[in-house]
A protein has these predicted regions:
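Catalytic domains of carbohydrate-active enzymes that cleave complex glycans
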Residues: 1-154
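Extracytoplasmic
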Residues: 146-168
Length: 168
């Protein structure tokens, strides 16, 4: 089964082997399959069908969300290691992952906003406000002692660049 972040950190700090799937392995799996989905979606021809374009955009949206969560898992793991060891390198890794995570939220929201209303009602969590959540994603970087340094983002067809909408 999966190993929790606290269990993993305890084993990591004490240099003890663990049985199961670590949080970093979970993140790697999510990133792998997100990349596969994005590569596949990028090869599809969207010229003939509006419905197909929306479906492909949904696949891309979920892949970007996967990348967001994968980097959040890595950030949470590194932050827990930092809190146990107080070694600055783990705080730096945390900030790097939070910046990556915020950047992927931006990609997720860009495609999501191009096809959906904001905020969007979802059955599981209620309303999701993509712009507000982007602000939270950037706050996570600064509240952990980092500076915003998100990956560059190219505009997508029909997409919205969130910075242009005064969300940062």
């Amino acid at each position: 089964g999966n190993i929790s972040i606290p269990e993993y950190v305890k084993a990591f700090v004490s240099n003890t082997p663990v049985q199961g799937i670590t949080p970093l392995q979970v993140a790697a799996y999510i990133l792998k399959y997100s990349d596969i989905a994005l590569t596949w979606a990028g090869k599809q021809s969207l010229a003939n069908s509006h419905e197909l374009r929306i479906t492909i955009d949904d696949i891309k949206t979920m892949a970007w969300l996967g990348k967001y969560y994968a980097h959040k898992i890595k950030a949470a793991t590194y932050l827990a290691i930092f809190r146990e060891t107080l070694q600055k390198e783990w705080q730096n890794k945390t900030i790097d992952e939070l910046n990556a995570s915020a950047g992927y939220w931006r990609h997720y929201a860009t495609i999501g906003l191009s096809n959906n209303h904001n905020p969007l009602w979802t059955n599981r969590v209620g309303y999701v406000d993509w712009k507000e959540n982007f602000q939270w994603a950037t706050y996570e970087v600064t509240s952990n002692g980092g500076k915003l340094n998100m990956p560059s983002m190219r505009p997508t067809p029909g997409g919205t660049i969130l910075e242009a909408e005064n969300t940062v």
